[in-house]
UniProtKB/Swiss-Prot annotation:
Pathway: Cofactor biosynthesis; adenosylcobalamin biosynthesis; precorrin-2 from uroporphyrinogen III: step 1/1; Cofactor biosynthesis; adenosylcobalamin biosynthesis; sirohydrochlorin from precorrin-2: step 1/1; Porphyrin-containing compound metabolism; siroheme biosynthesis; precorrin-2 from uroporphyrinogen III: step 1/1; Porphyrin-containing compound metabolism; siroheme biosynthesis; siroheme from sirohydrochlorin: step 1/1
UniProt xrefs under HAMAP family: Siroheme_synth (MF_01646)
EC annotation from Swiss-Prot or TrEMBL: 2.1.1.107, 1.3.1.76, 4.99.1.4
Positions of disulphide bridges: none
Protein function: Then it catalyzes the NAD-dependent ring dehydrogenation of precorrin-2 to yield sirohydrochlorin. Finally, it catalyzes the ferrochelation of sirohydrochlorin to yield siroheme.
Top-level taxon in the UniProt lineage: Bacteria
Catalytic residue positions: 248, 270
Annotated protein name in UniProt: Siroheme synthase
Catalytic reaction(s) noted: uroporphyrinogen III + 2 S-adenosyl-L-methionine = precorrin-2 + 2 S-adenosyl-L-homocysteine + H(+); precorrin-2 + NAD(+) = sirohydrochlorin + NADH + 2 H(+); siroheme + 2 H(+) = sirohydrochlorin + Fe(2+)
Annotated organism of origin: Bordetella avium (strain 197N)
């Protein structure tokens, strides 16, 4: 271990920053956040530092570096763009046995400032010992995405309740189990939703019970259309915490690869020709079964669970069986596929509204308002329509939509294998057969579909 990691309490202590530029400004602001009494030594200051000095938030030591500036300093940071000045600062600090950091110069530093992930009071520090600061910064960025911003509030709540938890759970093993529940259960979930009152109530109720509930919970997560980069941060965190993942067949392997490695993965997607109601009933059973076994369950759906994903039915089943749940929205296929094809769903010249339509209904196609769908100045996005293209185009034309209306069929939208087949509405079924378009594919009908010709950026239309 090249460096010894240490966290320092600098509240009220004098910290000297030598330099008045942008880097010095960032360092001074970070030190102020930690409660330090900051002095900045420099001939001139950035507007932000000048404002802080004018408001007496910092002390400005004006002029060229003077070793006398160090006499009251507890820590020193040299942040000038002149290595000669930085060397003088470092040597003066060493002569007085004071810790000094020269920004981006490990050879002239007796301590280094790490990259941090701040979820105060929880702080994670990352250091490459000054050898690879870009790598440390990249790791910090990844950790930022994994650590929910509610962790600080959770740590503060746990600290506030520590005496009560110790009193209610005298046995060490029971206390550890309680803390595991606190970190993984409804208290943490409420804080993630920015509901501190509900979190406190859940904690009070748990402390009043002689034993913890063994029930788990279900998180309904929208995985997006395929590109793993479109998974939300909340969705990623849920996958990293899951014990069991019940996923549809359309969820990409790349998204599943982001999940916790030891999580049990169960494919529950429906196949063409299956009894979908029976399959859905089995999904309901699995969610309840695993949650009641105390497991954290992620129900992972392609796109967004509430856009033609039967997410509402699944929540109704969970509510009826008393299972706790949470919903993490996803990017639905219409939004993502259109964007990846270069198609703006609305455009002031062509479309003032968007209709999301499923071509796979409980009843037949007569359930749709074809007169309304055939009107102009709107965009239609049809889900699950590959097997209904003849009917869709014929109905739209019969109800007044011109056969010359542009369409775009987007197959495997947002994935490396994405294809976009374009044409006129009267040619829809024929073009799809010629190009052997297969599911999953999204159909967009409207003047905006033609824009893919000149706005495409991901692959080629």
């Amino acid at each position: 271990m090249k460096l010894f990691p240490i966290f320092s309490d600098i509240k009220g202590r004098c910290v000297l920053v030598v330099g008045g530029g942008a880097v010095a400004t960032r360092k001074a602001q970070a030190l102020l956040e930690a409660g330090a009494a900051v002095s900045v030594g420099a001939p001139t200051l950035t507007p932000e530092l000048a404002r802080l000095a004018q408001g007496q938030t910092i002390t400005h030591l004006q002029g060229e570096f003077d070793a006398d500036w160090l006499k009251d300093a507890w820590l020193i940071i040299a942040a000038t763009d002149d290595r000669t000045v930085n060397t003088r600062v470092y040597e003066a600090a060493c002569a007085r046995r004071q810790f000094c950091n020269v920004v981006d110069d490990p050879a002239l530093s007796s301590f280094q400032v790490p990259s941090i992930v701040d979820r105060s009071p929880l702080i994670v520090a990352i250091s490459s010992s000054g050898l690879a600061p870009v790598l440390a910064r990249r790791l910090r960025e990844r950790l930022e995405s994994l650590f929910d911003h509610s962790l600080g509030a959770l740590a503060e709540l746990a600290a506030r309740y520590r005496p009560a938890i110790r009193a209610a759970r005298a046995d060490l093993k029971e206390r550890r189990r309680f803390y595991d529940w606190l970190l993984d259960g409804p208290v943490a979930a409420a804080l993630r939703r920015a509901q501190p009152q509900q979190a406190q109530e859940a904690l009070d109720e748990a402390l009043a019970r002689p034993a913890l509930s063994q029930d788990g919970r279900v998180v309904l997560v929208g995985a997006g259309p395929g590109d793993p980069g479109l998974l939300t941060l909340k969705g990623l965190r849920a996958l990293n915490e899951a014990d069991v993942i019940l996923h549809d067949r359309l969820v990409s392997a790349e998204v599943l690869a982001l999940a916790r490695r030891d999580a049990e993965r169960i494919t529950v997607g429906k196949r063409l020709g299956e009894n979908h109601n029976a399959t859905q009933a089995r999904i309901h059973e699995l969610m309840v079964e695993h949650a009641r076994a105390g497991r954290r369950v992620v129900r992972l759906k392609g796109g967004d669970a509430f856009i033609f994903g039967r997410g509402g039915e699944e929540l109704e089943h969970l509510r009826a069986h008393g299972v706790d749940y949470e919903v993490v929205p996803g990017i639905t296929a219409a939004l993502a596929c259109a964007a990846y094809a270069g198609i703006p769903l609305t455009h002031r010249d062509y479309a003032q509204s968007v209709h999301l339509v499923t071509a796979h209904c409980r009843a037949d196609e007569e359930a749709l308002d074809w007169d309304g769908l055939a009107r102009g100045q709107q965009t239609l996005a049809f889900y699950m329509g590959v097997g209904q293209l003849d009917i869709l185009s014929a109905r739209l034309v019969a109800h007044g939509r011109p056969g010359s209306t542009p369409f775009a069929l987007i197959e495997n939208g947002s994935r490396p294998s994405q294809r976009v087949v374009m044409g006129r509405l009267s040619q829809l079924a024929e073009r799809a057969r010629e190009q052997a378009v297969a599911s999953p594919a999204l159909l967009i009908v409207g003047e905006v579909a033609a824009l893919a010709d000149r706005l495409a950026w991901f692959g080629k239309p």
